[in-house]
Amino acid sequence: MFRGLSSWLGLQQPVAGGGQPNGDAPPEQPSETVAESAEEELQQAGDQELLHQAKDFGNYLFNFASAATKKITESVAETAQTIKKSVEEGKIDGIIDKTIIGDFQKEQKKFVEEQHTKKSEAAVPPWVDTNDEETIQQQILALSADKRNFLRDPPAGVQFNFDFDQMYPVALVMLQEDELLSKMRFALVPKLVKEEVFWRNYFYRVSLIKQSAQLTALAAQQQAAGKEEKSNGREQDLPLAEAVRPKTPPVVIKSQLKTQEDEEEISTSPGVSEFVSDAFDACNLNQEDLRKEMEQLVLDKKQEETAVLEEDSADWEKELQQELQEYEVVTESEKRDENWDKEIEKMLQEEN
């Protein structure tokens, strides 16, 4: 066995031809020495092998530790760079979401969404509880037919307070009620206008429609109240009007007074006959003209009496104003009559 091992290690060369070695060859070493040297060589080879394996394992551990350290360093540096970049850009929501503050914000957001849901359930269209719901509803629904109602901002200087969060539930209700509004929103937002601006312009025009309806209703109420007060005042003033109003038309009384004054003036004038007809005969005036003038006077008096009767059906204020005008007219007519009488007297005096 040792011989085969020594031959494997190259310690002994076989002799060619199986002959005896030459006489000059050194004497053969003892087998025990060969075995010991072989064992030493095997031990040295095993030690070297173990040393080599230990070196390889140490190198492997060193390389692994170096690679792990490098990866950890790179990961820490990358994380630090990401945090720095997020802080600079303000995108720290992802980091905050992983903390207690993030959990609190999630709960708060959930609570706000629940409140929005409750408001949406309680929200109603803008035309509810108005005076004329049907008319206002038609006018509001007609706004969705023209996109200018959503693109044009309120005029400059107009104070229109719009809270998007507060009106958001109403907007959701209107999207359900008005299909054309939903299509208009899909076509305009966000291509031509922002979401908040879209609803601001829309609800501004809705408020104009509601204000117009309120003003119309208020004007109608004031008009009805004024008519009622007027009728009540007329009923209250009716007894006083009956007491103050003369039993006979004022024109008739004035005509009688005017006749008496004419008679007095004619009777006191010198050289004048007792009656006006005598005076006309004395002057040789045209009887036809005189008759026409008298008829005209009668017609004028009848017209005045008819006007007075028509004025009796008007209200008290108009009657008072009309009576004042009649007094002025009578005064002017009296002045004309006086001038006419003076002319007659002058003519009679010239004839005499």
Swiss-Prot record:
Phosphorylated. Phosphorylation increases in a mTORC2-mediated manner in response to epidermal growth factor (EGF) stimulation. The modification Phosphoserine is found at S269, S313. GO terms for biological process: cell differentiation; cellular response to epidermal growth factor stimulus; cellular response to insulin stimulus; cellular response to insulin-like growth factor stimulus; cellular response to platelet-derived growth factor stimulus; positive regulation of fat cell differentiation; positive regulation of protein serine/threonine kinase activity; regulation of short-term neuronal synaptic plasticity. It is found in: Cytoplasm, Perinuclear region; Golgi apparatus; Perikaryon; Cell projection, Axon. One of its GO terms (cellular component) is Golgi apparatus. Pfam families: BSD (PF03909). Keywords: Cell membrane, Cell projection, Cytoplasm, Differentiation, Golgi apparatus, Membrane, Phosphoprotein, Postsynaptic cell membrane, Synapse. Expressed in heart, placenta, lung, liver, skeletal muscle, kidney and pancreas. The modification Phosphothreonine is found at T248. It comes from the Eukaryota. Residues 1-45 are annotated as: Disordered. The keyword RNA-binding does not apply. Its main location: cytoplasm. Interacts (via phosphorylated form and BSD domain) with AKT1; this interaction is enhanced in a mTORC2-mediated manner in response to epidermal growth factor (EGF) stimulation and activates AKT1. Plays a role in adipocyte differentiation by promoting mTORC2-mediated phosphorylation of AKT1 at 'Ser-473' after growth factor stimulation. This is Synapse-associated protein 1. It comes from Homo sapiens (Human). The lineage of its organism: Eukaryota, Metazoa, Chordata, Craniata, Vertebrata. The gene is SYAP1.
